[in-house]
């Protein structure tokens, strides 16, 4: 185990001394010939520069570059696809919440709509607000609050304007009636 660890360490040190990570990742991409969109070049570079750990994609690249042949052995395509899809899986972590949302939607659809009670509507509202909070739906609440504040501000402005215009018209009438105009 120590020998394997030392070999990997030596290989990573040599690769960082004699080459650059973007070139190595481009070479790796050419040698592996992955499906379009399955090879993430940025992730490979980050793994090469040891900024991301674990590094399944980069270890696959070092194996591919270490081999003299242009193609990998028949046993390695499984390893190739596993490493490539593992990097994609790390990008898809946010999709773990989808089953919870799906179950809420299915439960809501399963309820009979004809027998809807006000209590059920309130429960749906509470559930919807919780989902809205959990999945970042705050913008709608903020937007409506801003809209309401703008309406209040505008109505206050209009009220002041109307009061001033009424006072102004009353002054004109009184001045006109007194003959001061």
From Swiss-Prot:
Q: Where are the sequence repeats?
A: 109-114, 115-120
User: Which ranges are annotated Acidic residues under compositional bias?
Assistant: 112-125
Tissue spec: Expressed predominantly in the spinal cord and brain, being more abundant in the hypothalamus and striatum. Also found in small amounts in ovary.
- Single Gene Ontology MF annotation: opioid peptide activity
Q: Where in the cell is it found?
A: Secreted
Q: Its GO biological process terms? A: chemical synaptic transmission; female pregnancy; neuron-neuron synaptic transmission; neuropeptide signaling pathway; sensory perception; sensory perception of pain
UniProt signal peptide: 1-19
PTM comment: the record says:
Specific enzymatic cleavages at paired basic residues probably yield other active peptides besides nociceptin. The N-terminal domain contains 6 conserved cysteines thought to be involved in disulfide bonding and/or processing.
UniProt GO cellular component terms? axon terminus; dendrite; extracellular region; neuronal cell body; plasma membrane; synaptic membrane
**Propiece residue ranges:** 20-95, 174-181
Q: Where is this region: Disordered?
A: 103-125
Q: What's the main place this protein lives? A: secreted
Q: Which PANTHER family match?
A: PREPRONOCICEPTIN, PROENKEPHALIN
**Any idea what this protein is called?**
Prepronociceptin
Source organism of this protein record = Rattus norvegicus (Rat)
The record lists the lineage as: Eukaryota, Metazoa, Chordata, Craniata, Vertebrata
């Amino acid at each position: 185990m120590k020998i394997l660890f030392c070999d990997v360490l030596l290989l990573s040190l040599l690769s960082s001394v004699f080459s650059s990570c973007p070139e190595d990742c481009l070479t790796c991409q050419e040698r592996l010939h992955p499906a379009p969109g399955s090879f993430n070049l940025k992730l490979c570079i980050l793994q090469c520069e040891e900024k991301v750990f674990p590094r399944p994609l980069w270890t696959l690249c070092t194996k591919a570059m270490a081999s003299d042949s242009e193609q990998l052995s028949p046993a390695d395509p499984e390893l190739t696809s596993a490493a490539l899809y593992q990097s994609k899986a790390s990008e898809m972590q946010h999709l773990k919440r989808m089953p919870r949302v799906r179950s809420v939607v299915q439960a809501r659809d399963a309820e009979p709509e004809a027998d809807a009670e006000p209590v059920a509507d309130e429960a749906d509202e509470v559930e919807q607000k919780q989902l809205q909070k959990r999945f970042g739906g705050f913008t709608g609440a903020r937007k409506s609050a801003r809209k309401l504040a703008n309406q209040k501000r505008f109505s206050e402005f209009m009220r002041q304007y109307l009061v001033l215009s009424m006072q102004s018209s009353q002054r004109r009438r009184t001045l006109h009636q007194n003959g001061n105009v």
